[in-house]
From Swiss-Prot:
PROSITE patterns: GATASE_TYPE_1, IGPS. The gene is TRP1. Residues 509-752 are annotated as: N-(5'-phosphoribosyl)anthranilate isomerase. Gene3D superfamilies: 3.40.50.880, Aldolase class I. This is Multifunctional tryptophan biosynthesis protein. It comes from Cryptococcus neoformans var. neoformans serotype D (strain JEC21 / ATCC MYA-565) (Filobasidiella neoformans). Trifunctional enzyme bearing the Gln amidotransferase (GATase) domain of anthranilate synthase, indole-glycerolphosphate synthase, and phosphoribosylanthranilate isomerase activities.
Length: 752
């Protein structure tokens, strides 16, 4: 009778294994990992004495602390049965090219329920074995070598507890079947010592593991998912726990979330499908992805709103925000920050909650935190649940993105009426990527009116071109964008768009402020002024009455009727102030601006209606948020001190006032007094750029303060590109009001 060689990796559990082997007739011979050579082992095998090998548990890492174990495994595969326990499993996985890393949990002397495939060493063993664990490392499913298959996992968290070689009689378990707290340990050892030779099949057919080339016996499946837990199942279990915990917190309870939605506390929606279809080029679904199960950390410190603005300004149609915290390091707060960051864009991207959505509560969460759509993964949902979640999402105004991985899942997606279907080239059960998946699913669509998207593995223009030729409308790109050194250039190159270029502006517009009569107005209009400002601040020297302002308004409207506008479609990639300045520049002119300072909102609204103002200028300490309630574009004044300090609010904040006016003003405020501030400060502020543009898009401003016909050209030159309008009042006045020659000279100096 031959013996079982038990390699001891200096672990006390070796003696338990020895006892189990002996009790089931395994005739164990134990030797420590540094007290025997591979040559000696080969000799035992040649002499017909060695029938099987067990690699024991042990401390440390398999590469540094397992002695001869790895060499023994490499030699013995295909010759005789091998069983690895704990460190033994790690040796096998590491030797074959897999990754051994942190398991996501530390278990020392703890038990877990283990579910298994009921074949091999698990033949005839009951399910959900209570099993003792002593480890913090484990095999990583995303890097598991293709020659190995998962045989068992923990029921609670999906950590790999067992692997098997697909061809050779090599088995391994991560837990300790030899422990007195583990169930089925001796049954497992009894199965192992019955195995013969080095390959499956033949005399090993009794245990159910198919020989190479044979088909595995079918197992019960749901929606194509294997009965054994995979990374997808593990995430599924964790997300259920996450949601359960969130629902228990009073502030995020289902009732509170529902109430918030009923109060319209959520941001307004845009139509996800329409946003995709209306994109004039291939729609990019740009993903914010800090990490993933398959790649680990990608960009763990990335700012979600910053990344979102890069994507939006480069032309992304959708921003996909991963909100799963454990494997992808995302959060709902990321999504809300992204939604707020892009809110001021003229044609903002749709926001997708990319997560493993399992309940109506998660859809409510998505809506409350700013999503326009959610991802529904067919592989994670039973057909009835898929239908219920799809219908519920649509009832909230959110057409879901339904993810499929094969024609069978496509059929389920079509049955529920999906209008936007994404094909994941990555199988979520094993995280392998097959770039032909999208093509196969597209062929199965048979020309149906569905927006088809490719969802993974896309990193080049060639990848995109291939799918576009097959009818794909949108592509989701995550890792490649997150790793790109120039995000905007890379995104545009993916879909064949030229690099973004800042279009040089024409000469600035001219605003003549302090118009006090129709004569002043005629003079300014005749000289070619674009905007006329009337002061409506009681107690100031240039303040005019409402009746005079109405007369000036009528004159301005008459002159405007004879001018032409420049039709302008806001660029999909233009930020707030650039868009607003372009829109104002394209309008028929002249335009009438009413100037107010520290007056009530009701007074301002009354004046807009009574006078017929085209714009409002807030020249005092009014809240910027008032711009939301004023029915015409708002110019907000910000004071620049001699030291370059800006006062008056958040001058770069988008989404409120349509224009920024920089005027002189010291610590106490001031401004509007014909005093200049150093123009290099204006240049610095302009070059700080629109929010999210990283300085590549100058901040458009109206330049005011101490301008005259003699210095305005120098001011524009020193302040640089970004001055889209210049504002003058006292610089073109004489004792009796506006001076024709000065006004004409000023306009000429600006226009060149």
């Amino acid at each position: 009778m031959g013996f079982t060689l038990l390699i001891d990796n200096y672990d006390s559990f070796t003696w338990n294994i020895y006892a189990d082997l002996a009790s089931v007739g395994g005739n164990p011979y134990v030797v420590r990992n540094d007290k025997i050579t591979l040559k000696e082992i080969e000799g035992m095998f040649s002499d017909g004495e060695l029938e099987r090998i067990v690699i024991s548990p042990g401390p440390g890492h398999p590469r540094t602390d397992s002695g001869v174990s790895r060499d023994v495994i490499a030699w013995g595969m295909g010759k005789l049965p091998i069983l690895g326990v704990c460190m033994g499993l790690e040796c096998i996985v590491d030797l074959l090219g897999g990754e051994i890393a942190y398991a996501g949990e530390i278990k020392h002397g703890k038990t877990s329920l283990v579910q298994h495939d009921s074949i091999g060493v698990f033949h005839n063993l009951p399910q959900f074995l209570s099993s003792t664990r002593y480890h913090s490392l484990s095999a990583q499913i995303q890097s598991l070598p293709s020659v190995l298959q998962v045989t068992s996992t923990t029921k609670e968290s999906g950590v790999i507890m067992g692997v098997r070689h697909r061809t050779y009689t090599v088995e391994a378990v991560q837990y300790h079947p030899e422990s007195c707290m583990s169930e089925g340990g001796r049954g497992l050892m009894a199965n192992f010592i019955q195995m013969k030779g080095g390959k499956w099949g033949g005399e090993n057919a009794w245990c159910g593991v198919p020989a190479e080339g044979e088909e595995e016996q079918p197992k019960a499946k749901t929606n194509g998912a294997p009965s054994l837990p995979t990374i997808l199942n593990r995430i599924h279990a964790q997300r259920l726990l996450d949601v359960e915990q969130a629902e228990k917190v009073p502030a995020t309870s289902p009732a509170n979330v529902s109430t918030s939605l009923s109060l319209y506390a959520s941001p307004p929606l845009i139509n996800f499908r329409d946003r995709m279809v209306s994109t004039p080029h291939t729609a990019v679904m740009a993903e914010i992805k800090r990490a993933s199960p398959s790649k680990g950390d990608i960009a763990p410190t990335a700012s979600a709103p910053e990344q979102a603005l890069k994507y939006a300004l480069a032309g992304a149609s959708v921003i996909s925000v991963l909100t799963e915290p454990t494997w992808f390091k995302g959060s709902l707060l990321d999504m809300l920050a992204v939604r707020n960051a892009v809110d001021s864009l003229p044609n903002r991207p749709a926001i997708l909650r990319k997560d493993f959505v399992l309940s109506k509560y998660m859809i409510d969460e998505a809506r409350l935190y700013g999503a326009d759509t959610v991802l529904l993964i067919v592989a994670m949902l039973e057909p009835q649940q898929l239908k219920e979640l799809y219908d519920y999402s649509v009832s909230l105004g959110m057409e879901p993105l339904v993810e499929v991985n094969n024609p069978t899942e496509l059929s389920l997606a079509l049955e529920i009426g999906s209008k936007v279907i994404g094909v994941n080239n990555r199988n979520l059960h094993d995280f392998n990527v097959d770039m032909s998946t999208t093509s196969r699913v597209n062929a199965a669509l048979n020309g149906r009116d569905v927006v088809l998207c490719a969802l993974s593995g896309i990193s080049s223009h060639e990848d995109v071109e291939k799918y576009v030729k097959e009818g794909v409308k949108g592509v989701l790109v995550g890792e490649a964008l997150m790793r790109a050194s120039d995000t905007k250039a890379f995104l545009r190159s993916l879909i064949g768009l030229p690099p973004l270029e800042v279009v040089p502006k024409s000469r600035p517009l001219v605003k003549i402020c302090g118009i006090r009569s129709t004569d002043d107005a005629k003079l300014a209009i005749s000289a070619g002024a674009d905007l006329l400002g009337v002061i409506l601040v009681p107690g100031t020297k240039r303040c005019i009455s409402t009746s005079t302002a109405r007369e000036i308004s009528a004159l301005v409207q008459s002159a405007r009727s004879q001018s032409s506008s420049k039709p302008l479609e806001p660029s999909l990639s233009s930020p707030w102030f650039t868009t607003q300045s372009d829109l104002l520049s394209s309008r028929r002119k002249p335009l009438l601006v009413g100037v107010f300072q520290n007056q009530s909102l009701s007074d301002i609204l009354s004046a807009v209606e009574e006078i017929g103002l085209d714009l409002v200028q807030l020249h005092g300490d009014e809240p910027q948020a008032w711009a939301k309630f004023i029915p015409v574009p708002v110019v907000k004044v910000f004071r620049v001190s001699p030291e370059g300090i800006v006062r008056g609010g958040e001058f770069r904040r988008p989404g409120l006032n349509q224009a920024i006016l920089l005027d002189a003003g010291g610590v106490s405020g001031g401004g509007g007094e014909g005093k200049a501030f150093p123009w290099e400060h204006a240049k610095r502020l302009i070059q700080s750029g629109e929010v999210g543009s990283e300085g590549h898009m100058p901040l458009p401003v109206i330049l005011a303060g101490g301008l005259t016909p003699e210095n305005v050209g120098q001011a524009i030159e020193q302040a640089g590109e970004g001055v889209w309008c210049v504002d003058v009042s006292s610089g073109v006045e004489g004792e009796g009001g506006k001076v024709k020659e000065k006004v004409e000279a000023f306009v000429k100096a600006v226009r060149g």
